Amino acid sequence: MKHQLMIPSVLYTGVGSIAESIKEIIEKEQAKKVLVFTDQGIIGAGLLDLLLDPLKDHGTAYEIFSDLRPEPSYEDVEKIRRQAENSEGDLIVAFGGGSVMDAAKLVSILKGSDYSVKDLLANPSLGRKQMKSVAIPTTCGTGSEATCNAIVAVPEEEVKKGIVNTAMIPDYVILDAQVIKKLPKSIVAATGVDALAHVVECYTSKKATPLSNTYALAGAKLIFGNIREEIGRASCRERV
């Protein structure tokens, strides 16, 4: 029986790994200007400096796109797509939670294309990779950094819909537990439970494979062993 597993091309991990990893990626991709996708909550918490400081040290130009609300609509994504198209950036970096990463993933297949988000809702296979992307998640549980789908709201139908296209899988992912040190324990716990829901879903899926089950079981053990009272300890947060 044939099994398939789709994951990001390159994964960097480790506490404090953002600075060295992002410089390595920029040099590898020969990027001249980075388009940084984030939100006002991240900026207000002072977390974005973990990314901006190494960009400044490296002398890399960047532009910040932070006008993103939770669960953005397809219109919100089109707005930020137009803003990105007016920029000369050549690498996308998503620094945030699921909504930020989903928007960035969509722009990575929209920028400079002749199709819209509504076109992708009708026919996701239209999407083609337009820009390389880097995902730096700031919460434990969305999993958007590792998937080929993105969720957008469709206000006129009062629903949320998913767009699935393998071209949206980030080219690079940086997992740095230092990012979640400033998060309230309640947020870490809530997103940790979200992560647990994902591994349970993975294990019980009709499309589960021996390889995906291995990851799901390992993930469940890490979460169960670290999410309770010790969630405030940095070592436990890193495992979650």
Report each predicted region and the residues it spans:
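An N-terminal, well-structured beta->alpha segment
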Residues: 1-64
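A glycine/threonine-rich phosphate-anchoring loop and its flanking beta-alpha core
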Residues: 112-210, 219
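Local beta-strand N-terminus motif with an aromatic residue
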Residues: 31-33, 89, 170
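Active-site segments that bind and position negatively charged phosphate/pyrophosphate groups
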Residues: 202-237
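Catalytic cores of large soluble enzymes that bind and process phosphate-bearing ligands
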Residues: 10-14, 43, 69-72, 184, ...
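N-terminal small/polar loop signature for handling phosphorylated ligands or for N-terminal nucleophile
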Residues: 43-115, 229, 233-235
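Conserved beta-strand elements of the Class I
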Residues: 35-36, 91-93, 134
